[in-house]
Amino acid sequence: MKNFHVVLEAAWLVRDVKTADDAIGVAISEAGKRLNPKLDFVEVDVGTTSCPLCGEPFSSVFIAANTALVGLIFEMKVFDAESAEHAERIAKSVIGKSLRDIPLTVVEVTEFERSTEKGEQQHKSKTEK
C-alpha cells in the first residue's frame, strides 16, 4: 500500500463582494466551515491561474456584477491507497461529502513515503515508477 498527497480544485461562487480579497476571504471561510472540524486535515488555499499573455501567475478570482468565482485548492494526504487512482477516489469522496454540489477536479497526485525520521518525507511523482 502506498501513500499519496492529493490536490483537488473547485470553483467557489461568492455573492455580494466588491474586491478580490473579500471574495477570497469569504470563499475560504465558507469552505472551512463545511470541512471543519471533521476534516481539519484538509488544507484549503486559493488556486493560481497563469496570464495567457505574459504567463505570470495570479490568484484565481474573477469578479463581475458583485459576484465572484474563486478557484480553491484542497490538499490532503491519503494513506495506504492501492494506487494513485484509488487515492484520487478516496480524496474526492472524503472532501466531496462535506462540499455537496461543488464539483472537484484532480490537479495533482504525488506519492510519498513515510520516513523513519520524524517530519521528513520522500516524494515521488505520479508518473515515476
UniProtKB/Swiss-Prot annotation:
It comes from the Archaea. It holds the Pfam family DUF555. PANTHER family: UPF0212 PROTEIN MJ0068, UPF0212 PROTEIN TK1194. Belongs to the UPF0212 family. This is UPF0212 protein Mbar_A2902.
